[in-house]
UniProtKB/Swiss-Prot annotation:
Homooligomer. Interacts with the replication-associated protein (REP). Interacts with host proliferating cell nuclear antigen (PCNA). Interacts with host retinoblastoma-related protein 1 (RBR1), and may thereby deregulate the host cell cycle. Oligomerization and interaction with PCNA are necessary for optimal replication enhancement. Increases viral DNA accumulation. Enhances infectivity and symptom expression. Signal peptide: none annotated. The lineage of its organism: Viruses, Monodnaviria, Shotokuvirae, Cressdnaviricota, Repensiviricetes. Transmembrane segments: none annotated. This is Replication enhancer protein. Pfam families: Gemini_AL3. Belongs to the geminiviridae replication enhancer protein family.
Length: 134
């Protein structure tokens, strides 16, 4: 859903993409929170934010695009190492597809968390997407 207007994002908007080789560093990855074994539970909670950079947003007609993922995992990774592996695997998957779009980034994250990395318990996704009016 577009955060500014409240309208649902259409399928053509979600699938609208850019060839990966046309833009350098198209995505920005950031770990916003890493709770290690909270409340004596046997899993970590890692929050990752993926931001589309200015050049890809300009081509796709997007004002703002943040994808936030909250990951429950039984792995005990170091924060920097997890981010490095996660980023590498997501970009590798997108490179194999050849096109970066909102849906392809979500597919790439799903592939990495459930097929590449082991011990993923649950993932929740929230987003802040705003399309340009003009």
């Amino acid at each position: 859903m577009d955060s500014r207007t409240g309208e649902l994002i259409t399928a053509p908007q979600a699938e609208n993409g850019v060839f990966i080789w046309e833009i350098n560093n198209p995505l920005y990855f950031k770990i916003t929170e890493h709770s290690q074994r909270p409340f004596l539970m046997n899993h970590d909670i890692i929050s990752i934010q993926i931001r589309f950079n200015h050049n890809i947003r300009k081509v796709m007609g997007i004002h703002k695009c943040f994808l936030d993922f909250r990951i429950w995992t039984t792995l005990q990774p170091q924060t920097g190492h997890f981010l490095r592996v996660f980023r590498y695997e997501v970009l590798k998957y997108l490179d194999s597809l050849g096109v970066i779009s909102i849906n392809n980034v979500i597919r790439a994250v799903d592939h990495v968390l459930y097929d590449v990395l082991e011990n993923t318990i649950n993932v929740t996704e929230t987003h802040d997407i705003k399309y340009k009016f003009y």
